C-alpha cells in the first residue's frame, strides 16, 4: 500500500515538471541534429553541341545527379544541385559530351535558389525540424521566373497556340517559324524580351505545337539570327519525320553549328534543306560536291539542297557498301546442283516429318544446336508479337544470354539420332516456302576436313512461318556440313540453326555490281546442266580479278587491302603487279601494315 502511494506522488511531480519546464530544458541532451546543406549553384560549359535534354540525360546516366532550375543557353548552363551531389557532378569535369568536353565550376556566392533556401530557414518556427525540400525551392524559383511574363501559364499556352495557328498552313502541313523576333503577338506577350524567358520559349513552343499540330512535314526557321541549331534542337524531337526544313538567312557558319542534328537518328527522313543566306554557303562556294556530301552524311535521305538536286553519285555512295551485294554463291555448277536438290528435300522433311528426316539424313555422329538472336535489328517487316513467342527456342538456345552455365550450354549441344530427334520435335511446326527464290540465299562450296575428308559447307539465309502461331514469320540462318554417304548419298554431320526476328530479304537484293543468281525452281530432283544460268561477263571479270589478288597475296604476303591496291594500280596485270611490288620492296618503301 505504501509503495503504491509513493509511485503516485512521484508521477504527480513528474507531470508538474513537464508542464512548468520550458521546452528547451525538457529536451534530453544528445547528438546535435543534422542540418541540410543548402544547394550548390554550378555553371557548365562545353555543352553547346548537345541539347538541354541531352545534357540532363547524360549527367543522370553517368553520375545519377539531377540538375535543377536549369537556365540553358549556347554559351553556358547554370543549374542547382544538392550539396551532397556536387562531388559526383564535379567528376564529369573534362568528360566527353556531344563532340566536346564539359567544364564544371561551382559559383561563389548564393544563387537565387540558395537565397530562397536561407530565407526559408530563418523563418522556421521552433517546431520545424527540416529544411524545405529542394523540389519546393526549385518550384518557387520557377514561379519567380514565370513572374516576368505578363500572362498566367494557361494564358501563355493559349496565346502560343494562337500564334502557331496563324503560322500553320494545313493544306501543305507547313509551319512558318521565321522571323520570330518581329512577330506582333510574341512582342505583345513579352516572351522574347528577356534572356531568361527567351531561352525557354522555343521548347515551350514545340511542346504546344506537338499537341496541336503533330502532322507537320515542312518548317521554316528563316531570319531568326541563329548561330547554330542548339537553341532549336527540340524541333527534331517534336517532328522526327520532318521532310522539308529552311534555315535561310541565319548566321550558321560551320558544319559544327549543325552538329546537334548531325546524328542520323535526329532527322532521318529530311529530304530538303535550305541554307541560303548563311555564311556556310560562302564557305563551300567553290566546293559544291563537298557541300552536298557533308549534308548528305548528316541527313541520309536529303535530295534537295538550296533548291539543287543532290548529285546521283553522292546518293549512291550513301546507299552502297564497299563491296557489291551478292546473292547465292557456289564454287562449281556441280555444287549448286547438289545443294539445290539437297535443300529442297531437307526443308520438305523438316516441315513434314522431322524424326524421319533425322534418321534418314543425319549421321549417327551428327551434332545439332540452336542459337536465338532475339535482339537483332528490327525492321518495318518485324511483327510486334514475334518476341512474345520465343519460349521454345530459349529452352534449347546455346546463346550465352539464355544458358546460365557451361554445363547447361553443353547439354544443349545435341549429338546422335536420339538427342537430335527429341530436340527438333520440341520446336514449333514450320513451313518453308521455297517457291520465291528472291526470299532466299544459298551458299555452297567444297572443302576438305582432316577428320572426315571431302565435304560441302552450306549456308542458308531465309524465312519460315509458324502455322500454329497465326502464321508468324521468322528469319533464320542455317549452316550445314554434309558428306557423301547414307541411303540418300548425303549425310549431315553438323547443323547450326540461328533464329531471328523477321527482317525480310532486302539485305541481299542485288545491286548494280552484284553477281548473277540462280533462279532455278527448287525441286526434289537435281537441275539439269542446261537449266543452269551461265555466268554473266561481269561475274567472269570479278572472278579473274579475285584470282589475281589471291596470287599476289600468296606470292608477296600482302594483306587483302594492299594486294587489291597493287593489282588495281597495275591494271590487273599479274606480272606488272608483281614487278611493281618487287621494285617498291627493294626501295624499302612498303609500310609494315601492308603485311599485317
UniProtKB/Swiss-Prot annotation:
Keywords: Cytoplasm, Leucine-rich repeat, mRNA transport, Nucleus, Phosphoprotein, Repeat, Transport. Belongs to the NXF family. It comes from the Eukaryota. One of its GO terms (molecular function) is RNA binding. One of its GO terms (cellular component) is nuclear pore. Involved in the export of mRNA from the nucleus to the cytoplasm. It holds the Pfam family NXF_NTF2. This is mRNA export factor mex67. The modification Phosphoserine is found at residues 128, 130, 133. Residues 543-596 form the TAP-C domain. The gene is mex67.
Amino acid at each position: 500500500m505504501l509503495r503504491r502511494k509513493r509511485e503516485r506522488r512521484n508521477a504527480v511531480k513528474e507531470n508538474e515538471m513537464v508542464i512548468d519546464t520550458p521546452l528547451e530544458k525538457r529536451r534530453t541532451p544528445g547528438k546535435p541534429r543534422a542540418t541540410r546543406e543548402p544547394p550548390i549553384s554550378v555553371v557548365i560549359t562545353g555543352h553547346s553541341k548537345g541539347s538541354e535534354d541531352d545534357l540532363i540525360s547524360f549527367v543522370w546516366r553517368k553520375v545519377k545527379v539531377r540538375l535543377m532550375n536549369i537556365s540553358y543557353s549556347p554559351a553556358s548552363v547554370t543549374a542547382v544541385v544538392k550539396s551532397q551531389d556536387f562531388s559526383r557532378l564535379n567528376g564529369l569535369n573534362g568528360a566527353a559530351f556531344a563532340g566536346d568536353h564539359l567544364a564544371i565550376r561551382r559559383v561563389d556566392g548564393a544563387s537565387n535558389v540558395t537565397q530562397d533556401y536561407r530565407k526559408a530557414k530563418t523563418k522556421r518556427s521552433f517546431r520545424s525540424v527540416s529544411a524545405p525540400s529542394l523540389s519546393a525551392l526549385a518550384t518557387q524559383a520557377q514561379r519567380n521566373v514565370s513572374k516576368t511574363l505578363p500572362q498566367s501559364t494557361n494564358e501563355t499556352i493559349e496565346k502560343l497556340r494562337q500564334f502557331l495557328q496563324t503560322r500553320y498552313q494545313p493544306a501543305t502541313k507547313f509551319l512558318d517559324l521565321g522571323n520570330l523576333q518581329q512577330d506582333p503577338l510574341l512582342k505583345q506577350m513579352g516572351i522574347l524580351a528577356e534572356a531568361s524567358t527567351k531561352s525557354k520559349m522555343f521548347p515551350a513552343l514545340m511542346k504546344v505545337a506537338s499537341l496541336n499540330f503533330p502532322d507537320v512535314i515542312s518548317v521554316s526557321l528563316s531570319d531568326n539570327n541563329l548561330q547554330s541549331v542548339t537553341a532549336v534542337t527540340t524541333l527534331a524531337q517534336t517532328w522526327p519525320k520532318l521532310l522539308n526544313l529552311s534555315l535561310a538567312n541565319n548566321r550558321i557558319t560551320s558544319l559544327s553549328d549543325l552538329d546537334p542534328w548531325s546524328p542520323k537518328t535526329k532527322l532521318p527522313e529530311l529530304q530538303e534543306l535550305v541554307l541560303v543566306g548563311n555564311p556556310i554557303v560562302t564557305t563551300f562556294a567553290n566546293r559544291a560536291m563537298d557541300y552536298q556530301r557533308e549534308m548528305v552524311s548528316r541527313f541520309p535521305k536529303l535530295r534537295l539542297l538550296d533548291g539543287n538536286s543532290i548529285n546521283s553519285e553522292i546518293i549512291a555512295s550513301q546507299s552502297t557498301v564497299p563491296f557489291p551485294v551478292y546473292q547465292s554463291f557456289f564454287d562449281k555448277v556441280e555444287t549448286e546442283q547438289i545443294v539445290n536438290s539437297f535443300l529442297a528435300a531437307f526443308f520438305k522433311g523438316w516441315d513434314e516429318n522431322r524424326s524421319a528426316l533425322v534418321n534418314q539424313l543425319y549421321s549417327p555422329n551428327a551434332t545439332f544446336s540452336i542459337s536465338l538472336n532475339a535482339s537483332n535489328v528490327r525492321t518495318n517487316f518485324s511483327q510486334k508479337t514475334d518476341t512474345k513467342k520465343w519460349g521454345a527456342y530459349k529452352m534449347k538456345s546455346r546463346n550465352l544470354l539464355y544458358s546460365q552455365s557451361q554445363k547447361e550450354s553443353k547439354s544443349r549441344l545435341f549429338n546422335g539420332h536420339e538427342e537430335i530427334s527429341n530436340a527438333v520435335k520440341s520446336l514449333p511446326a514450320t513451313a518453308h516456302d521455297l517457291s520465291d527464290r528472291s526470299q532466299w540465299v544459298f551458299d555452297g562450296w567444297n572443302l576438305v576436313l582432316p577428320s572426315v575428308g571431302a565435304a560441302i559447307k552450306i549456308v542458308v539465309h531465309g524465312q519460315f512461318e509458324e502455322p500454329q502461331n497465326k502464321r508468324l514469320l521468322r528469319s533464320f540462318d542455317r549452316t550445314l556440313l554434309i558428306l557423301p554417304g547414307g541411303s540418300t548419298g548425303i549425310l549431315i554431320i553438323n547443323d547450326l540453326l540461328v533464329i531471328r526476328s523477321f527482317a525480310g530479304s532486302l539485305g541481299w537484293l542485288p545491286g548494280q555490281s552484284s553477281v548473277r543468281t540462280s533462279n532455278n525452281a527448287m525441286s526434289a530432283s537435281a537441275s539439269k546442266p542446261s537449266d543452269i544460268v551461265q555466268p554473266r561477263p561481269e561475274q567472269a571479270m570479278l572472278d579473274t580479278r579475285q584470282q589475281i589478288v589471291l596470287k599476289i597475296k600468296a606470292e608477296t604476303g600482302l594483306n587483302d587491302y594492299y594486294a587489291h591496291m597493287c593489282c588495281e594500280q597495275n591494271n590487273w596485270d599479274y606480272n606488272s603487279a608483281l614487278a611493281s611490288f618487287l621494285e617498291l620492296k627493294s626501295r624499302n618503301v612498303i609500310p609494315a601494315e601492308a603485311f599485317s
